[in-house]
Amino acid sequence: MSRPAESAIHPASNLLPGFDHKKLRTTGADINYAVGGSGPPLLLLHGNPLTHVSWHKVAPSLAERFTVVIPDLRGYGDSSKPDGGEDHSAYSFRAMAQDNVELMRSLGFDRFQLAGHDRGARVAFRMALDAPQAVSRLAALDIVPT
């Protein structure tokens, strides 16, 4: 089972007061994330070409009522950039969704609320389809249908 790494000083610390910055090795990638607050778990997924820091204006306020988890999707920010392979499956929405289900489980959250922006919303939809038992609510922001 994956385990969270120890906290480290992160350059974004001043933008996310009260958040701990950590890394987790999932099945397919090393995921950089920040976690803060207390209450029901809320996972926020950023869009393209952003990082977890894109939530810095709302995450501290949300952390007053929720345990907020904000990762860098694989390939973004300080998360690892695995080889995509010929079919690019390492960067599929399914692979990114699995990373984040593993992340939330490693933090003790088998069920959580989820919000995604842009690419993060696509990952959120995939997660709700692949792991419906994990997602209690889903909000999608700025997503273009394909």
Model-derived segments and their meaning:
Residues 65, 107-146:
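Conserved hydrolase catalytic core segment
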Residues 18-21, 51-52, 119, 125-126:
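Tryptophan-centric aromatic hotspots in well-structured domains and transmembrane helices
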Residues 13, 60, 94, 103-106, ...:
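A general structural signal for stabilizing positions within well-ordered secondary structure
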Residues 27, 70-119, 145:
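Active-site loop/oxyanion-hole signature of alpha/beta-hydrolase fold enzymes
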Residues 56, 101, 125-129:
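Short, hydrophobic alpha-helix immediately C-terminal to the catalytic nucleophile
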Residues 20, 41-44, 69, 115, ...:
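Conserved Rossmann-like nucleotide-binding pocket used by diverse enzymes
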Residues 1-41, 64-66, 91, 110:
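Alpha/beta-hydrolase fold catalytic core
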Residues 29-82, 103:
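Conserved HGGG/HGGXW glycine-rich cap/lid loop of the alpha/beta-hydrolase fold
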